Amino acid sequence: MKILLLTLVVVTIMCLDLGYTTKCYKTGERIISETCPPGQDLCYMKTWCDVFCGSRGRVIELGCTATCPTVKPHEQITCCSTDNCNPHPKMKQR
């Protein structure tokens, strides 16, 4: 009986995946996939135009967040909750 209970406890712990955190793409010097800090379980992609928008295209920011950011005028924001669900648009073409 003790072995059965111990087995159930071990299986339960393995199935819970304790301490899981989301992985998101983040922008910086280069685009990388990183584990998000605890409490930041969403990935986001924010785009907007700056003064170079006509020649370079929209600015793209990727990262982790606890809540989806509020959209400001002339910004577009998308949020998602699975690992690396916020790839840079050019990465999707590969």
From Swiss-Prot:
Where does the secretion signal sit in this chain?
A: 1-21
**Family annotation (CDD domains):** TFP_snake_toxin (cd00206)
InterPro entries, per this entry?
Snake_3FTx (IPR003571), Snake_toxin-like_sf (IPR045860), Snake_toxin_con_site (IPR018354), Toxin_cobra-type (IPR054131)
A GO molecular function held by the record: acetylcholine receptor inhibitor activity
Cellular localisation: Secreted
Record keywords, A-Z: Acetylcholine receptor inhibiting toxin, Disulfide bond, Ion channel impairing toxin, Neurotoxin, Postsynaptic neurotoxin, Secreted, Signal, Toxin
Q: Which domain of life is it from?
A: Eukaryota
* Organs and tissues of expression: Expressed by the venom gland.
Instruction: Please name every pair of cysteines joined by a disulfide bond in this record.
Output: C24-C43, C36-C64, C49-C53, C68-C79, C80-C85
Primary place of residence? Answer: secreted
What's a Pfam family in this record? Toxin_cobra-type
Record's GO cellular component, any one?
extracellular region
Its biological purpose is as follows:
Binds with high affinity to muscular (alpha-1/CHRNA1) and neuronal (alpha-7/CHRNA7) nicotinic acetylcholine receptor (nAChR) and inhibits acetylcholine from binding to the receptor, thereby impairing neuromuscular and neuronal transmission. Recombinant LNTX1 leads to a functional block of the muscle-type acetylcholine receptors. Has a cytotoxic activity.
Could you give the subunit structure recorded for this chain? Monomer.
Protein family: Belongs to the three-finger toxin family. Long-chain subfamily. Type II alpha-neurotoxin sub-subfamily.
What is the protein's name according to its record?
Long neurotoxin LNTX1
Organism of origin:
Ophiophagus hannah
